[in-house]
Amino acid sequence: WDAIRFEVDHRDEDGQFMLTGSAVPVEAKKIHHTGTGRYGWLTMRPMSLWESGDSTGEISLSDLFLTPDKIGALNKLTLPMLAFVVCRGGWPKALQKKTEKAALLQATEYYKAITNSDISRVDNVKRDAERAKRIMRSYARHQGSQASIATILADISTNEPEDVSDETIDAYLTALRKIFVIEDMPAWNPNLRSKTAVRTSNTRYYVDPSVGVAALGLGPNDLINDLNTFGLFFETMCVRDLRVYADALDGSVYHYRDKNGLECDAVVHLRNGSYGLIEIKLGGEKLIEDGAKTLTALSNIIDTSRMKAPAFCMVL
């Protein structure tokens, strides 16, 4: 790090080096210079369905912003195929496996490594592997919600041999964030026509749905037999892909929820002020129509005299 920083100053040119990190980030105290003005930070995420070859890529996020009225394509992914890609995840190594069974093991082994070693290695604090598993299982059950630390604590406390504090749960979650296992989604706070209290709690998500599936010990058939659970993991996969595509457009992904219960799963907001509203539904005509009604309701309360109207509304 420091040697490259010196070389960057010496050459005085852009785009010379690319540094990639491991699952456990380097200790900050070992770095003598922050790199401000020399380094740009880029979050590397698991592969999207387009990158893993499971999506045709016929509809791009940029097209939705630029020409939403000229969108048309047919999705060929069946329910069993979706269940498989949710459980397999976006891990490059999983694509190299010769069988589906071997591909599914990749996320399971990653989950074991997280709980047995990575969660302790991140800051050299010994953490209990079984407690880490309980917290990750609870987090998986609450993904897509604004579950508080107190909720997660109540969820795991019956299986805890001793009293656990909120601070302990928070420390485990912080460690999981540092090693890029979970990534909460911040709240979106638009200009509204009326004074409505907007909820500001983050929404819980795994960086990749396969880790949550592995935490609960589920497989593709389990998801197909429980569409409610499948829907939660499908949402996490969609959020993963939206984040990948939004990053490429220099955008961010948020969620919206107000005191009246009006909720929007994802808002992709670009730096130029353009944004799209997205409801995520696994399928079913009624659920899709419900999603469309929600998007229309949210669009109608946005004060377009103080901010842009949505570039698009999409049921994903």
Tell what function each PLM region has.
Residues W1-A3:
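Conserved AAA+/SF3 P-loop NTPase catalytic/coupling segment centered on the Walker-B
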Residues R5-D14, I301-D303:
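Substrate-engagement module of ASCE P-loop NTPases
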Residues D9-I31, L176:
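Sensor-1/coupling segment of RecA-like P-loop NTPase cores
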Residues G21-V24, A28-S145:
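Interdomain motor-coupling "hinge/lid" segment immediately C-terminal to the ATP-binding subdomain
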Residues S274-G276, F312:
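Structural motif
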Residues L282-L316:
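Catalytic cores of nucleic-acid endonucleases
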